[in-house]
Amino acid sequence: MVQNRSLHHTYFIPVVLYVLLILDGFLINAFPGQFVSEEYILVPHLALFGFVLFSYYFPKQPMQLYAILFGLLFDSYYSGILGVYAVAFAVIVYFVKKMQRFLAENVFVLALLFIVAIVMVDSFVFGFYSLMDITQLDFSAFASERLGPTIVLNIVLFIVIYYPLFKLVGWMYD
């Protein structure tokens, strides 16, 4: 497995996570009509992909700490309620680290983990917002108008960014 080689350049992990976090907001602001309409809401989850990728390939790195810190940053910039995404990202990192030892190391497994992470995070946030009466959507509307389109968008984004980030992971081990 990749993690048996020596790891260098770990300082790039928070830098890449920060760039992915900024890209999440950039995509929504640069193309607002494409991501939000009356029929659907598309939410890019590039930062979440970063957490899945780095937790999968670098299980000994302090990803829980990064998840909490970047989750708080994400909350302060995007959601306005501190702690929601911090908890969600930390749970995803824990989940990926626990699942990683049972799974084969390939692109399809990583894609599946990413899709499961999207479902977990978006469902958690939806449930929290529903409990707090922040959203008026019912679960079927959430699933059809937000979760489904979000998964499709993020599969496309996964196809676009997987190879460059995988090469970065390889470089970090050299």
Give names to the regions the model predicted.
Residues M1-D174:
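Terminal, non-globular segments
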